[in-house]
């Protein structure tokens, strides 16, 4: 490449468009003295606009927009941000809970209608970003978050009501459940026909092969708007964020005897697109409530999503210095027991699973599928083949007789997703009588394996995976944060006044990845001092038992708790026009047949 066009400058980031696809225009008011005459001829500058109500752009408009995903994020920042967290904490006091059994200690009457139970779920990528920023371990970053959200020196130290978060969960636990159910889903598609109903009791059929992962909301939003033909291939499982929301809302609602609207769930994620996911109408209590009132307003399973950078803004707004918080676990006096002790042991297990480098930084969906089928086929081995770039990798599980058992792949970044979509695009029917159907033509279709050869594909919108999410702490923010903290690692961070070079940005992402993978060694050291780690098949039994207990205790089928649906999204821009008059229809017809007035 030339010095001007360098591979270091390639990036999938799309800056938000300067013009909205549905702009709000200010037009002069119509003269009420004039009446409409469909046959009146006038000049363009004399046309009076209708007196319409003020235009509003809602989240629904953004979800139905045919523009890029990033344009919607700018609107969502104002709808789900650290300011909303502060406003909610100030508007609603915490419901007092018994520190012995986790039950509500006051009568639920008119006086306490404003009370809320605040819960939070935090992704491991967020902890890795904080650990790299402040030069601490992943475990210490976990302590920092808990002290900030629930401790006496964090959010509870200020605000109108001194409210904080009663329970803070690690999404790794729910991710483990999704991984096990994903392997089950892949196994079902390998042994049954595509149109067969799922054995989990879901009313919908199994996804088509290859199954495409559905945990990345940027990828899902893109598929629903642009390539609806891939929707039958999407995994029906909820993401760990969505599953955590359903888990909290169902268990606490039934155990505490309060409606889901009085449980406020915050998710801290590495990605702005998680705000889009939380706003989906499929991820509300309407999807799992057995008996719904006609006047019932759907309540989100995840009420608000903030990113890692927004958590820094949240702390700054309250005047809290995150690195000055105690880097140790909270005393049990600040954490009441979860109402259901069986689910408490599941959700707050002492050794939450970490991630190995082989699993990647996006949850390890593909890695778990391969490991599961390898455990079910003793003597088999995994053969890895790198694709056109580092974000495309193909895997083949070979039996002891060197015959392929399963093929899978990993596609990160929209550049590579385009190639995957081309492989899955249905063949075009020939317009000539008796002609053969024509396969799609493209670079992605001409090279590599056919998309239908895969049993499972892990798809993520961000190049490099979720540790490189758009909401993560950037190197510029890390420089500013570390410059105010006197630590032994402050010398490793370059001068905050200089613009980071591509090499420095890659080095920063490597530090975040290192912190992310370090969680595995912490988990292993803890587990080694207590008991031997569970095998994959033992983990499957543990997860299946927990999911079965959750479903039975709630009286809700697992198909409603852990699975979701997708839909084709069409742009509604320009479609909400008033019904055309007879004159308009005649004019349109005349224009189509070449006539006129």
Swiss-Prot record:
SUPFAM superfamilies in the cross-refs: Fe-only hydrogenase
UniProt-annotated binding residues for [4Fe-4S] cluster 1: 20, 62, 65, 68
GO molecular function: 4 iron, 4 sulfur cluster binding; iron-sulfur cluster binding; metal ion binding
UniProt xrefs under Gene3D superfamilies: 3.40.50.1780, Fe-only Hydrogenase (Larger Subunit), Chain L, domain 3
Membrane-crossing segments per the record: none
Keywords carried by this UniProt record: 4Fe-4S, Iron, Iron-sulfur, Metal-binding
GO BP term, example: iron-sulfur cluster assembly
Disordered: annotated segments: 428-449, 479-505
Sections of the chain in a coiled coil: none
Entry binding sites for [4Fe-4S] cluster 2: 216, 271, 462, 466
Signal peptide: none
InterPro entries registered for this protein in UniProt: Cytosolic_Fe-S_CAF (IPR050340), Fe_hydrogenase (IPR009016), Fe_hydrogenase_lsu_C (IPR004108)
Lineage: superkingdom: Eukaryota
Role of this protein: Component of the cytosolic Fe/S protein assembly machinery. Required for maturation of extramitochondrial Fe/S proteins. May play a role in the transfer of pre-assembled Fe/S clusters to target apoproteins.
Family stated for the protein in its record: Belongs to the NARF family.
Protein name according to UniProt: Cytosolic Fe-S cluster assembly factor nar1
Gene, per the UniProt record: nar1
């Amino acid at each position: 490449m030339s010095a001007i066009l360098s591979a270091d400058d390639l990036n999938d980031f799309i800056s938000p468009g300067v013009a909205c696809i549905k702009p709000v225009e200010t037009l002069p008011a119509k003269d009420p003295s004039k009446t409409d005459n469909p046959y009146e001829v006038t000049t363009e500058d004399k046309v009076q606009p209708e007196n319409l109500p003020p235009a509003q752009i809602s989240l629904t408009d953004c979800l139905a927009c045919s523009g890029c995903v990033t344009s919607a994020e700018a609107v969502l920042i104002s709808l789900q941000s650290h300011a909303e967290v502060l406003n909610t904490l100030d508007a609603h006091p915490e419901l007092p809970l018994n520190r012995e059994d986790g039950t509500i200690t006051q009568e639920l009457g008119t006086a306490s209608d404003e009370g809320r139970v605040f819960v939070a779920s935090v992704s491991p990528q967020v902890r890795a970003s904080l650990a790299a920023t402040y030069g601490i371990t992943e475990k210490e970053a976990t302590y920092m978050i808990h002290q900030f959200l629930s401790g006496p020196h964090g959010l509870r130290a200020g605000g109108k009501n001194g409210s904080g978060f009663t329970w803070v969960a690690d999404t790794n636990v729910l991710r483990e459940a999704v991984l096990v159910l994903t392997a089950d889903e892949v196994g079902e598609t390998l042994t049954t026909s595509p149109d067969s109903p799922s054995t989990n009791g879901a009313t919908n059929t199994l996804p088509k092969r290859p199954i495409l992962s559905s945990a990345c909301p940027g990828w899902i939003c893109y598929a629903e708007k642009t390539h609806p033909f891939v929707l039958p291939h999407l995994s029906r499982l909820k993401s760990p964020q969505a599953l955590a929301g359903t888990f909290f809302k169902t268990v606490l609602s039934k155990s505490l005897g309060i409606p889901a609207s009085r449980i406020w769930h915050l998710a801290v994620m590495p990605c702005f697109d998680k705000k889009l996911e939380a706003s989906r109408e499929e991820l509300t209590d309407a999807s799992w409530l057995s008996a719904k009132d006609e006047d019932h307003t759907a309540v989100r399973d995840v009420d608000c999503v903030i990113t890692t950078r927004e958590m820094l803004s949240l702390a700054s707004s309250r005047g809290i210095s995150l690195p000055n918080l105690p880097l140790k676990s909270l005393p049990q006096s600040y954490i009441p027991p979860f109402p259901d002790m069986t689910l408490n042991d599941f959700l707050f297990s002492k050794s939450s699973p970490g991630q190995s480098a082989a699993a990647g930084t996006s949850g390890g969906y593909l890695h778990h599928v391969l490991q599961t089928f390898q455990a079910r086929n003793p003597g088999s081995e995994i053969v890895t083949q790198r694709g056109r770039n580092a974000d495309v990798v193909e895997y083949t599980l070979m039996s002891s007789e060197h015959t392929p058992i399963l093929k899978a792949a990993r596609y990160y970044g929209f550049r590579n997703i385009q190639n995957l979509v081309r492989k899955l695009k249905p063949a075009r029917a020939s317009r000539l009588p008796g002609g053969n159907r024509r396969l799609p033509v493209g670079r992605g279709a001409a090279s590599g394996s056919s998309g239908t050869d895969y049993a499972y594909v892990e798809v993520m919108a961000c190049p490099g995976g979720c540790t490189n999410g758009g909401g993560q702490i950037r190197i510029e923010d890390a420089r500013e944060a570390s410059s105010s903290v006197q630590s032994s690692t402050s010398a490793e961070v370059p001068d905050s006044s200089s613009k980071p070079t591509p090499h420095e940005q890659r080095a920063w992402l490597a530090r975040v990845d290192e912190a992310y993978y370090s969680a595995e060694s912490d988990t292993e050291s803890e587990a080694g001092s207590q008991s031997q780690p569970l095998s994959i098949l033992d983990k499957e039994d543990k997860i299946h038992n927990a999911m079965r207990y959750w479903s039975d205790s709630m009286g809700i089928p697992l198909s409603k708790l852990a699975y979701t649906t997708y839909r084709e999204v069409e742009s509604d821009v320009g479609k909400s026009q008033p019904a055309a008059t007879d004159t308009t229809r005649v004019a349109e017809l005349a224009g189509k047949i070449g006539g006129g007035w």
